[in-house]
Design a protein with these regions (language model features):
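Short glycine-rich anion-binding loops that position phosphate/pyrophosphate groups of nucleotides
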Residues: 11, 55-57, 139-141
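Glycine/Thr-rich phosphate-binding loops of Rossmann-like dinucleotide-binding domains
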Residues: 13, 59-61, 144
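Active-site nucleotide/adenylate-binding loops and adjacent lid/helix of ATP-dependent enzymes
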Residues: 1-6, 41-44, 90-176, 180-181, ...
Length: 322
């Protein structure tokens, strides 16, 4: 199978070669204009499937600013040409936390309650509906952006201080109940043989450094700080996590694959923090993310993962044209 890897990174910074050794593949670092370049790739006839890992790109150099693009442009171009591609489609590409929360509530899936707020005054009113402790995050909270140890607030004064900081930097803040307890990840992937019944990988538990209880900028990107993941092997907990992840994946209508971040309180109740329809994959061993670990927990590893998402890409291509 001939695979085109669509990325916004250069091969020096992101090299999927160790994972794709069983395929004939080429990596294309996309720059704008995206639609024209994807059309040219399609018309070349060189590829059978497109492995899309683009997150969008903004060039810092003003001279290259016109080369930047939004990641949704890549998906839109792939869909417009009805090409077989992996990952999220335009229906579920970048949902807000509030959209996730609404869908979870409507489907009886536990979700960390919260609000998007745009000012200290708004936060002061809405915080009355939340239970402490409270976490103040970037409104989209990707990559732990803008999160620090002080992002956990135990008093109203702390909440308002953090809301002011985050809103001033990002224009809004996600203010939500912090679930004291353990944190887990659940990876759910399309089952091409039964698209309504996705496959769920063995979940992972996050093992935080001593004195830490959640991911934040100071520890997430410092590879000198000991941080680990552990496969969940307790049968009952494993089944509960897989079931909640699967239900959230289905309720959100995720295509391809998605990673749920889940907290468990002292009562054993599960609360999803988010479902990421574009989780990082194929990272280098020293930088493995949760999706990499969970894929490798499975006996078929990345071979099984690629088999599922490539077959799903063709299946969804047929569904779009039906």
């Amino acid at each position: 199978m001939r695979v085109c890897v669509l990325s916004d990174e250069y091969i020096e910074d992101f090299n999927p070669a160790p994972y794709l050794k069983d395929y004939d593949w080429k990596m294309v670092t996309l720059t704008a204009p995206v639609a024209e370049k994807i059309r040219a790739l399609a018309e070349s006839g060189d590829f059978d499937v497109f492995l899309n890992v683009c997150e969008g790109y903004e060039f810092e150099d003003e001279e290259d600013e016109e080369l930047g693009y939004e990641a949704i442009e890549v998906v839109a171009a792939l869909e417009a040409l009805n090409l077989p591609f992996t990952g999220a489609d335009s229906r579920c590409f970048d949902p807000t936390r509030e959209e996730m929360q609404s869908v979870a509530d409507a489907n009886g899936v536990g979700f960390a309650k919260g609000y998007r707020v745009y000012s200290v005054e708004e936060a002061e009113q809405l915080v009355k509906n939340l239970r402490f402790p409270i976490m103040i995050k970037h409104p989209k909270s990707y990559g732990s952006t803008g999160m620090f140890k002080d992002s956990r607030a135990d008093t109203l004064e702390q909440v308002l201080t953090q809301v002011k900081r985050v809103c001033s930097e990002f224009g809004a803040a996600r203010m939500e109940e912090f679930i004291v307890g353990k944190e887990f990840n659940v990876l759910v992937v399309d089952n091409p043989d039964d698209i309504e019944n996705p496959f769920v990988y063995p979940p992972a538990e996050l093992i935080f450094p001593v004195g830490e209880e959640f991911w934040h900028t100071d520890i997430k990107w410092d590879y000198n700080i000991p941080f680990d993941f552990k496969e969940v092997t307790d049968p009952e907990l494993k089944a509960k996590l897989q079931n909640e992840g699967k239900r959230m994946f289905q309720a959100m209508g995720i295509a391809g694959y998605g990673r749920c971040d889940v907290r468990m309180n002292e009562k054993g109740e599960l609360f999803i923090l988010e479902i990421n329809p574009n989780p990082a994959i194929m990272l280098s061993p020293k930088e493995y993310g949760p999706a990499d670990y969970m894929i490798l927990y499975d006996k078929d590893g990345y071979k099984g993962f690629f088999d599922r998402i490539f077959k799903s890409a063709f299946r969804r291509q047929k569904m779009r044209s039906a």
